[in-house]
């Protein structure tokens, strides 16, 4: 930084890498990883292609070295120099000019090494030696066989590395390595800013910011010294820049600063996301030393937990308002971390906002995302449920392990605590529940260590470094101490009876969870995504060797077929089966989410598993690895709409009737509900109609409804005892003025028995719109271009006979492209034609 005594030099230099012991070196990219460098240099095949995963896994039996040469200057009198590594994955030895300066053993930490007197004037050689993670966990497991998820490799619990790199029930065995974040040389004469902690005090018409600024002396970058507490010559100045550019400047080491008429930050769909830039400048005797710059949002955020008529509430409370959380669980974006960039993350999170998310849960089996992830969540209004990086395992809490994870916690809490989007810290994924059940536990000390880690160590760290952010000991949990972690009437729940338990979709309605932080259903990715890992038609069968290698949940393909036979007719073509699986997934999650939202106030969170994939695979994701939206993501856009009409129908499906056992009588009715997740009362016109399969109206009704802010309203039940369950359906809509803001349809039999007529789907293009026409009721209308990568304003929708207009919004892709390029591609592909189908075509 110009004019500051603390200098920061990034090693954006030329790097090279090789397999340790080999004479041949190859150009390397830092930040990056071993796999991405080997791919770039033609030294490995695509690990995602067919079963190449295993050849890629073998490469991690070896050690690797990275090396760069940089121009340095010797430390002057009074200066100290430090090497800073923001991300090393994972077991490394570091050498400067052939002298070992340190080693690392945690990818979740920042590592800094004192190199004062070791940097020469002129050329310096920096070398990083990566030890095989496979050899490391093998040796550690042989010494201490501590256990965890059976989907991962034995010993993964012994290394502070993203657990899912060793395999998961959606992930491959690809434990990549490398320098995945920047490397810097720090030169300082007076130390630096360690951290700035900003607490907010909200009152009517103003917000007071309270500042706790600490510094590190140049001799010890782990030592924290409060600024302004002693007469040592250190002072700081604060500048706050409002969204409109107005500046507030506070000099002379202010402990607080008042912002009048603040613009508050709200989650997406509830309000705006104005951000204030905060600059803190540290000086010594008037000489600028260092600067800290971040963006913050002005808001209060905690969890509202209090006894109520159903048990105990559990809701995000933002600016005093309880908000229903709507979103999905986020996993690492790519098995190859070198492919994750600010641009790829932006594309993914913008797709969350496009689908009306207001929250994401960062799952604990990966790694703490980059700063840009949280910056984007701040910008887009996505509340973050942040797991600490522990999942589905037990740990042996040795003194060394405890010291290691304490530093990990401090690093990440300091790094992330200022973010407006940070909704809560959570201790781990699914460990309280499984440890209580005795899963993976082989000795009593593992239970003791669990309690110590998540109910003592982490709370101690947070009490010191981030007391303002809510802490939850595990997910799921009812509050800790193994007190019924999956209690449906308290805390959060992971519900898997639909899917893992093979229960029908209707089972969701047996529960009124306070907050569902995991529930899911699998589907296959798009056909064009499948072709990225196999182009052989012999593989295009869900039980082929290659397709099962890209399905990591045991028995899941058969499970999809089991649910398929319950719901739809059997498809005779592979591509139709892919479509049917996505419709199953979308219908399953819709069944749950709409039920949870109808019971707003009792249930206050629906976070489905999962948002994304880290490689091309059959999974629970709503956006596949290539960025293509599955049917579920379009459904999410509708069932997470700020104002939504939904239907609680009683039909053959809810009765779970067995038509071959006996004559049965079951209720045929609907009860509509409108839920409003905005800060304004909404006046809507609700319309519904009983229709024949050709979409002709048998009986139509409408009702004007006022839905108070942040609430849901039920309409009266409508019974249809004489409905033709095989040939009639109900359509329903919510209108605000002249705009239909939400709609849907229900039938009274299983879809496989309903007598769908051929809707004779057709389309025409008008500017940036696709106009779809149907001559009968059509369920799940899918619009595809040849490369299956259009992003539309709506897709996989139900429609009665007539027309529906759909806007072309963009192109789905993991790659960052010039908008002009994809616009031209879309025009070319539209000229080649579109493919339309519906549930009628599942046959």
What are these regions (language model features)?
Residues 397-480:
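Active-site neighborhood of glycoside hydrolase catalytic domains
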Residues 326-328, 360-362, 384-386, 515-517, ...:
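Hydrophobic faces of well-ordered beta-strands that scaffold small-molecule active sites
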Residues 107, 169-172, 266-267, 329-341, ...:
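The substrate-binding groove and active-site-proximal loops of carbohydrate-active enzymes
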Residues 1-359, 489, 598-599, 628, ...:
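Secreted/periplasmic carbohydrate-active enzymes, especially glycoside hydrolases
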């Amino acid at each position: 930084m110009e004019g500051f005594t603390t200098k920061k030099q990034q090693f954006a230099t030329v790097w090279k890498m090789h397999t340790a012991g080999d004479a041949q070196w190859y150009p390397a990219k830092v930040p990056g990883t071993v796999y991405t460098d080997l791919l770039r240099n033609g030294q490995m095949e695509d690990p995602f292609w067919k079963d190449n995963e295993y050849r890629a896994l073998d490469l991690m039996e070896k050690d690797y070295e990275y090396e760069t040469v940089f121009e340095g200057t010797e430390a002057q009198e009074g200066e100290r120099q430090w090497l800073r590594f923001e991300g090393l994955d994972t077991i490394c030895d570091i050498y400067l000019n052939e002298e070992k300066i340190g080693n690392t053993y945690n990818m979740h930490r920042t590592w800094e090494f004192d190199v004062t007197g070791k940097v020469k004037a002129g050329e310096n050689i920096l070398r990083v030696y990566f030890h095989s993670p496979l050899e490391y966990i093998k040796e550690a497991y042989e010494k201490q066989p501590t256990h965890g998820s059976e989907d991962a490799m034995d010993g993964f619990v012994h290394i502070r590395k993203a657990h899912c790199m060793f395999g998961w029930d959606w992930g491959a065995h690809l434990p990549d390595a490398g320098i995945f974040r920047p490397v810097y040389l720090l030169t300082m004469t007076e130390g630096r800013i360690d951290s700035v902690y900003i607490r907010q005090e909200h009152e009517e018409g103003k917000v007071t910011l309270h500042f706790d600024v600490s510094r590190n002396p140049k001799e010890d970058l782990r030592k924290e010294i409060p600024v302004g507490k002693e007469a040592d010559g250190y002072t700081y100045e604060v500048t706050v820049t409002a969204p409109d550019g107005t500046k507030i400047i506070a000099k002379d080491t202010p402990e607080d600063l008042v912002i009048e008429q603040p613009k508050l930050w709200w989650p997406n769909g509830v309000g705006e996301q104005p951000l204030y830039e905060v600059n803190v400048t540290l000086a010594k005797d008037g000489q600028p030393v260092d600067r800290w710059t971040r963006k913050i949002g002005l808001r209060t955020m905690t969890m509202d937990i209090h006894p109520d008529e159903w048990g105990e509430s559990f809701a995000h409370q933002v600016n005093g308002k309880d908000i229903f959380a709507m979103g999905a669980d986020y996993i690492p974006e790519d098995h190859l971390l070198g492919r994750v960039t600010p641009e790829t993350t932006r594309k993914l999170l913008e797709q969350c906002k496009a689908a009306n998310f207001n929250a994401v849960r960062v799952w604990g089996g990966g790694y703490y995302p980059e700063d840009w992830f949280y910056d984007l969540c701040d910008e887009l209004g996505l509340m973050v449920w942040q797991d600490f990086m522990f999942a589905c395992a037990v740990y042996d809490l040795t003194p060394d392990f405890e010291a290691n994870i304490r530093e990990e916690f401090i690093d990440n809490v300091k790094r992330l605590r200022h973010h407006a989007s940070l909704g809560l810290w959570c201790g781990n994924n699914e460990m309280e529940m499984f440890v209580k059940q005795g899963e993976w536990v082989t000795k009593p000390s593992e239970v003791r260590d669990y309690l110590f880690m998540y109910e003592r160590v982490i709370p101690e760290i947070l009490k010191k470094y981030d007391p303002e952010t809510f802490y939850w000991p595990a997910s799921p949990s009812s509050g800790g101490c193994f007190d019924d972690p999956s209690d449906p009437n308290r805390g959060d729940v992971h519900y898997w009876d639909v899917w893992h338990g093979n229960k029908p979709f209707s089972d969701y309605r047996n529960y009124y969870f306070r907050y569902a932080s995991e529930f899911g259903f699998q589907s296959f990715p798009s056909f064009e995504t499948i072709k990225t890992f196999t182009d052989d038609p012999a593989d295009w069968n869900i039980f082929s060797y290659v397709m099962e290698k890209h399905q990591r949940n045991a028995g899941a393909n058969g499970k999809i077929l089991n649910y398929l036979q319950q719901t739809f007719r059997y498809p005779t073509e592979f591509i139709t089966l892919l479509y049917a699986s996505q419709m199953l997934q979308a219908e399953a999650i819709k069944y749950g989410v709409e039920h949870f939202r109808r019971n707003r106030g009792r249930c206050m969170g629906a976070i489905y598993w999962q948002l994304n994939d880290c490689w091309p695979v059959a999974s629970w994701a709503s956006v596949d690895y290539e960025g293509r939206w599955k049917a579920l993501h379009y459904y999410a856009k509708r069932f997470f709409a700020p104002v939504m009409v939904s239907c609680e129908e009683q039909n053959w499906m809810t009765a779970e009737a067995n038509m071959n056992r006996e004559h049965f009588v079951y209720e045929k009715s609907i009860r509509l509900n409108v839920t409003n997740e905005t800060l304004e009362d909404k006046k809507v016109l609700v319309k519904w109609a009983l229709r024949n399969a050709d979409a002709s109206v048998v009986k139509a009704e409408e009702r004007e409804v006022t839905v108070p802010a942040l609430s849901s309203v039920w309409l009266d039940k409508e019974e249809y005892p004489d409905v033709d369950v095989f040939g009639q359906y109900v359509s329903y809509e919510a209108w605000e003025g002249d705009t239909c803001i939400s709609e849907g349809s229900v039938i009274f039999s299983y879809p496989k028995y309903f007598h769908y007529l051929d809707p004779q789907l057709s389309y025409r293009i008008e500017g940036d719109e696709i106009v779809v026409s149907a001559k009968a009721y059509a369920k799940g209308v899918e619009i595809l271009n040849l490369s299956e990568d259009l992003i539309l304003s709506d897709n996989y929708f139900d429609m009665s006979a007539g027309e529906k207009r759909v806007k072309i919004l963009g192109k789905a892709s993991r790659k960052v492209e010039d908008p002009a390029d994809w616009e031209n591609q879309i025009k070319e592909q539209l000229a080649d034609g579109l493919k339309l189908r519906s549930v009628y075509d599942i046959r």
